[in-house]
Structures are given as structure tokens and as C-alpha cells.
Regions:
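Nucleotide-sugar donor-binding/catalytic module of glycosyltransferases
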Residues: 1-223, 234-235, 327-331
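Membrane-interface aromatic/basic loop that binds lipid-linked glycans or pyrophosphate carriers
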Residues: 3, 46, 56, 72-73, ...
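A broadly tuned preference for mixed-charge, low-complexity surface segments
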Residues: 94, 166-179, 249-252, 301-314
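Short, surface-exposed acidic
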Residues: 166, 236-243, 285-296
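Catalytic core of nucleotide-sugar-dependent glycosyltransferases
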Residues: 196-203, 209-243, 247-257, 261-281
Length: 331
């Protein structure tokens, strides 16, 4: 049995888009290929690849074909088929960076003292007509499931799955649940490497998408983020808590306000609730780090530009003012 199942989700991308990652996994040094398995989940039965594409790889590849249901449904299907002790979620257009990436990870496993592990990652942006690579600091990585490693049995015991009613922010929602249920934050550990091992790719088209959003699902996600902040208020220092507020709630608000289907009433409801939240904890949290806010804006940039309803400058500015404490109560 493999020690790590890598769950890769695929929608309609050509084989050439994902092939580099399959190739670099085949070049890994210092590991046993029996210890890893790739579960390729095709979101749409018609999107499966010929099996001979995978014949030459030294590790096992299993295709899982499901009716089109979106990224959350695809990842859930991967978890349902996984049997390894640990799992990792990987987009079809992402890549592991070096031929020693898996060695650094596999040397740590099975890591019995941890339920969640994470590694450094970079953001590879192709949306500006050229490749731009940016380092992703720790404080912003928790809006991603990428470059994270989850103990499968712990996820199943706690009933943690992706919310299929959300067609965006499913990563942040998933990790919010993970953090909320992981009562001992010492069960989270970093796999320290010389350089980042994972590259998250940002392109004009997402890997897998589903039309429509659920208003209440996003409201519940927002409340869950607040709950995580409250839960960890006594466990982490003020600086880490401020970072958590910014990277989850601020990112959520921006995406909600840029997505067709979220009602004006829901936008107002979220803004009012978060304003009261910040008022309540203002003395404890203090002023969020400006650099963190800029990083979250960078993470959100592509999503803001690609959504069917653009976010106005006024909305972004007003929300940033709320988060940095420039607005008084009731403003």
C-alpha cells in the first residue's frame, strides 16, 4: 500500500498541460515509487485519458471518472478512493518543482505526531501574458489545500469533506474546517526544505469549474472562518491571529463580492457581521499587518479579474478600511 495518495483533479485540459507534473514525479530521486500513487480524478467521464498515457511511469496511476460536478466533487471522489495513510491535493496544471521534492516529503512520513503537514510553495502566474513566479509566505498559504498533506483517517473520522455547494473558496473552507476540528494546533507541522517544492499555477481558466453558487453555503463558510479565529485566539499570538483573519475572511469577502449569484443582502449581511466581529476583538487583534493585506490582494487578484461581476474599487477600499480599523463602529 502506498504511503501517499496524490489526488490530481482534471476537467477539460489537454494532456500537455498536466504531463510535466507526471513527468517530474517519474524523475524523483531517493524514494520508492511503491510509496506513492496518483489518483487522477476526471471531472466528467468523457474527459478521461487513454490508459496507455500512464504505462511508462514507474509509479501507479489510477483514473477515477465521475460525472461533472466541480472541483469539490472531484476532490471528494479522490478521498473516497484513497487508501494511503496520507493524501495530497494537486491541480492538473500544478507541478512539483524539483526531482528531490518527494524525497523531502516521504522522509517525514508517516509522522505519527501530526495530522496535517505543509511545505513551502510558489505561485506561478500566467495571467499577465508572461510567466511571473512569486514566493507564497506561510501567512497566505492556508487559503490553499495545495502543498498540504492530510492524514486520511483523521479527515474521515472528523467527517471533513469539500463543500459541493461552493464553486469557489473551497480550499479556504476546507482548511477552516480542518483548523476548527484540530483542537491541538501542535498537530500541524512544517516539512522544512531548502527551497519550495510545489508550484501552484494560475491561468485564465481554472482546472475544474461548476456554474452557480449557493448563498447560504458562502454565509456558513464566512461564519466558520470567524469561528476558527475565535477558537485559536487563546492558542496563537495576536500577530498570527491577525494574519488568519486577513487571509481567510478578507479573501472570502473579496471573492463573494466578485461572484455572480451572491445577493446584495448577503453582501451587506457579511459586511455587518464582520464589522461587529472586528469591533469586538479590536483591542486584542490591533491593526493587521499591511504586508499581509497586500499579499492577500495579490492572491485574490486573478479571482477578482476572472469573475463575471467585477469588484468595484469602492467595495475593495471600504472593506480594506474595515479590516484595518479605519472605520468606526456603525460606519
Amino acid at each position: 500500500m502506498a504511503k501517499l495518495d496524490i489526488i490530481i483533479t482534471h476537467y477539460r485540459e489537454a494532456w500537455e498541460v498536466g504531463k510535466p507534473n507526471f513527468d517530474i514525479l517519474a524523475l524523483q530521486r531517493g524514494i520508492s515509487f511503491d510509496d506513492i500513487r496518483v489518483l487522477l480524478v476526471n471531472d466528467g467521464i468523457e474527459n478521461a485519458f487513454p490508459e496507455e498515457y500512464f504505462d511508462e511511469y514507474p509509479y501507479r496511476v489510477e483514473q477515477i471518472n465521475i460525472p461533472h460536478g466541480g472541483i469539490s466533487a472531484a476532490r471528494n471522489a479522490g478521498m473516497d478512493h484513497a487508501t494511503a495513510e496520507w493524501i495530497n491535493f494537486c491541480d492538473f496544471d500544478d507541478t512539483y518543482i524539483s526531482i528531490y521534492a518527494m524525497r523531502d516529503i516521504m522522509n517525514i512520513l508517516p509522522a505519527p505526531d501530526y495530522d496535517v503537514l505543509w511545505t513551502q510553495m510558489v505561485m506561478q502566474d500566467y495571467t499577465e501574458g508572461k510567466e511571473v513566479v512569486r514566493f507564497a509566505p506561510e501567512r497566505v498559504t492556508w487559503v490553499f489545500t495545495h502543498a498540504k498533506y492530510y492524514r486520511l483517517e483523521w479527515l474521515r473520522t472528523n467527517g471533513i469533506r469539500f463543500n459541493t455547494e461552493m464553486d469557489f473558496q473551497e480550499d479556504s473552507e476546507f482548511n477552516a474546517v480542518v483548523l476548527a476540528l484540530l483542537e491541538d494546533h501542535h498537530r500541524i507541522g512544517q516539512i522544512k526544505t531548502v527551497c519550495p517544492v510545489y508550484a501552484w499555477c494560475r491561468r485564465e481558466m481554472s482546472v475544474t469549474t461548476r456554474p452557480g453558487v449557493d448563498d447560504e453555503a458562502n454565509w456558513m463558510h464566512f461564519l466558520r472562518n470567524l469561528h476558527v479565529c475565535e477558537l485559536y485566539r487563546e492558542k496563537l499570538g495576536p500577530e498570527r491571529i491577525r494574519d488568519m483573519v486577513v487571509r481567510t475572511v478578507y479573501d472570502t469577502f473579496l471573492m463573494i463580492n466578485s461572484t455572480k449569484g451572491i445577493t446584495t443582502a448577503m453582501k451587506d449581511r457579511i459586511a455587518d457581521r464582520f464589522r461587529s466581529f472586528m469591533d469586538e476583538f479590536d483591542e486584542y487583534y490591533g491593526r493587521p499587518d499591511e504586508d499581509t493585506i497586500r499579499q492577500m490582494e495579490d492572491v485574490s487578484k486573478y479571482e477578482l479579474m476572472s469573475r463575471p461581476v467585477p469588484v468595484s474599487y469602492e467595495i475593495v477600499t471600504a472593506w480594506k478600511n474595515i479590516i484595518t480599523g479605519r472605520l468606526t463602529k456603525g460606519a
